Amino acid sequence: MAIGGAEDKLGATRILRRFVAEAGGSDARIVVCATASALGPEIVELYERLFTRLGVAEVVSARPRDRREADKQEHADAAAWATGVFFTGGNQMKLSAAIRGTRFGDAVVAAYDRGVIVGGTSAGASVVSEHMVGYGSPGAQPKFRMVAAAQGLGLLPGVIVDQHFSQRERFGRLINLVASSPDLLGIGLDEDTSILVTDETDLEVIGKGSVFCVDMRTALTDAATARGTAPLMISGAGVHFLPNGARFDLASRTLVSYRDHSAVDPGDLPEPTHDLATISRRVASEGVDDSVVARNARRRRRTKAQHKESP
């Protein structure tokens, strides 16, 4: 399960609930890996409390800070014990560099191969694919040299995943990478939106936003010859915008079915506490691009100025 970040943690918690259900419900054994995050114990505590609120009896943390720690047997044993592994947000380059090819990373891959659900939000979503977005600039227009790729864990072959897709204007950088590697299917996840992949090719969309897919196997592009920061020429790309309830076949890259399941019963969850809400907001803002932060600050200043000018 790959989540676009900022998943609902205080309301119906539709995505996290589904993750718990796939992990075994009340019998689930969930390992939370917060290696990507700079928030440390705070983010571990958040997800431990969230999963406990959702009825999970056993939640443990595995947070190797580097490859040496990721090679410790205790972390590999945790992945072998789990019925669900969850990667938090943060920095996907930090996460991949720390765990890929280590005992812990290999144990997560082995767990996935035997049917354990592996999920991640934000940076944790990017790392599930073989090729992932390492870093890049926001913007709607695909340009040469606006993004760099890196290796992920390889749980989803043939795709490349980006997150916070609409909210952080990452259309251009995903298009850029797929134009350069047209055999890959580009998948952009909006916030509070996820994909659940079963049987290797059956993709289901869960959440309130959309999932953007781009297929360039038959498209025309000048990505191989572009120079500098020039805009790319792309013609004939296949695109899909998939909302909640859509099912998509990754092998044929076609829509299988669509049934809207927007209405969600929030169940009998207790009301979130103030500190839980505060931590959730801090987690949601982690990893925001500097340009987005600056733009939001300018917008707030303009709004304040307009209020002052109003009679």
Predicted regions and their residues:
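C-terminal and late-domain segments of enzyme folds
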Residues: 1-26, 38-53, 133-134, 138-311
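Portal/gating segments that form or line small-molecule/metal binding sites
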Residues: 31, 37-82, 87, 94
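Catalytic nucleophile loop
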Residues: 87-89, 108-132
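Glycine/threonine-rich flexible loop motifs
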Residues: 92-102
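Short gly/pro/ser/thr-enriched loop/turn and capping motifs at secondary-structure boundaries
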Residues: 93-94, 125-128, 212
